[in-house]
């Protein structure tokens, strides 16, 4: 490997300062979503006595209101949505159970090639590993699906925008995963497949480094890679 023209990082000699956060969708897993009918049916079943069309109208009204009132980076979590819908339709759903039902009814996760080996590399080098995802589902729900695909022993924390209330690239999202990992921002790396949210945002926030997965324009000097499997090649134990 020619490191002369490549971005290169040394593993911090203090293992307590080693942390790496990853985006989820498109980075660690590909999500196969159910069709819209499956999604709506899973949602309608939570309000068995209501007319599905009324449920749909209220859902659209509330989500439109939330976006116009709070802007695109403020997350509307499933738990907040369910709390509102319960109040309108006089139901009493267990929001965590309902989230699990909805997510498992509408999502199938497929590991990205090279993701497990990359996570294992950083785990073997003493890194604490986190996931930060823009999703309306709580991190505890998402973590269950990541465990199902075999990542349970490789991930320490899962933080979602539903937990934080803000979506990437808002600083609150990055701050939440850094805090959950128990490190300072300058000790944490980030990787993902979206330039603004996963590459530029973490750098502006002050993370130690970030990597963009984009097969169309790999550039080792900038930390842009064609595959998640390339990321460990930027790290060395010593000069």
Located regions from the model:
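Asp-based, Mg2+/Mn2+-dependent phosphohydrolase catalytic module
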Residues: 1-22, 30-33, 47-53, 116, ...
């Amino acid at each position: 490997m020619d490191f002369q023209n490549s971005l290169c990082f040394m593993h911090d000699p203090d293992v307590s300062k080693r942390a790496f956060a990853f985006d989820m969708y498109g980075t660690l897993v590909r999500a196969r979503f159910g069709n819209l009918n499956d999604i709506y049916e899973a949602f309608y079943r939570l309000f068995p006595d209501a007319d599905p069309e009324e449920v749909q109208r209220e859902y659209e009204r509330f989500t439109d209101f939330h976006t116009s009132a709070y802007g695109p980076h403020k997350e509307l979590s499933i738990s907040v949505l369910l709390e509102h819908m319960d109040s309108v339709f006089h139901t009493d759903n267990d929001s965590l159970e309902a989230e699990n039902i909805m997510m498992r009814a509408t999502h199938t996760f497929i590991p990205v090639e090279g993701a497990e080996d990359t996570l294992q590399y950083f785990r073997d080098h003493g890194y604490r590993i986190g996931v930060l995802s823009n999703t309306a589902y709580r991190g505890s729900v998402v973590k269950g699906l990541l465990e199902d695909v075999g990542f349970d022993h490789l991930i320490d924390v899962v933080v979602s925008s539903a937990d934080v209330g803000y979506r990437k690239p808002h600083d609150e999202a990055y701050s939440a995963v850094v805090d959950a990992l128990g490190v300072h921002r300058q000790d944490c790396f980030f990787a993902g497949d979206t330039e603004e949210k996963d590459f530029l945002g973490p750098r502006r926030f002050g993370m130690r480094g970030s990597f963009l997965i984009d097969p169309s324009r790999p550039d080792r000097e900038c930390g842009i890679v064609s595959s998640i499997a390339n990321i460990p090649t930027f790290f060395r134990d010593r000069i």
